[in-house]
Amino acid sequence: MHSTVSDGWRDPDEVAHLAADRGVRVMALTDHDAFHGVERARSVAHRRGLGYIPALEVTTYPPNQMRHILGHGVDVAHPQLLSLIARTQGVFRRQVQAWLKVLDEQGIGRGLGLEAFAYKPTVMPGAVLKVLLQHGLMTETDAWDSARKAVDFMPADFYAPIPSPREAVDAIHAAGGLAVHAHPGSVPDQDLMKEVLPLVDGLEVYTRRHRAEQIPVYEELAGRHGLLMTVGTDYHGFNGADYEAPKTVIDIRYLEKLGARVQWPAVEQAG
């Protein structure tokens, strides 16, 4: 689940309320390369009686391959992990700055406060996209084309700071978490996706991003590599879309593997 901290359309507390309203019992806010929404989401989750897993989704190189690594049950203050995601946040910020410059030159979005993105602790192109779509200034396709063209002039090593999958997994493990390959069906080059499987602890098999015929493929891959199969929605609330809880229940073995990393409200109150 994603919030306005990265590229989601709803605030962290609203995302947690939606999860509770739809009967979810354990949730994780997995914003891209950021933890700024954790406290707000966890506070609401615990007030609503949900277990909470501190988590994030780490972007890895090359970014166009969508080899995103979920870190579940991580220490959100761990220096190695914070240093890693700061590198990616720097790339995102330069992307956004370049895009905002192009939009301003074209006279698009003036008066909408887009310049405020320069002061946000984290920023992604998807956050700018949200504003453009909400005000009907561009179609989604045109907006992404505009964003890509804005960074075409960047040097070849522009994306070099983004970590490799191995770096991401190592940092997640160092922070005490479990590493899960998110939505493997979204990776254009499936051979590159398979290279990551020996590194991770789990595979996100059950997600709305997978077609029905893809599920057995990733079940077989998970079994072959001894990976726990996880459940996710990859919810972004795009264009105000409602939240639909997963139809597959999380494997109890994965919750057992997470153990004390799942923060239950009773534990918080006792502390």
Description of each model-found segment:
Residues Y243:
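Nucleotide-sugar donor-binding patch of glycosyltransferase catalytic domains
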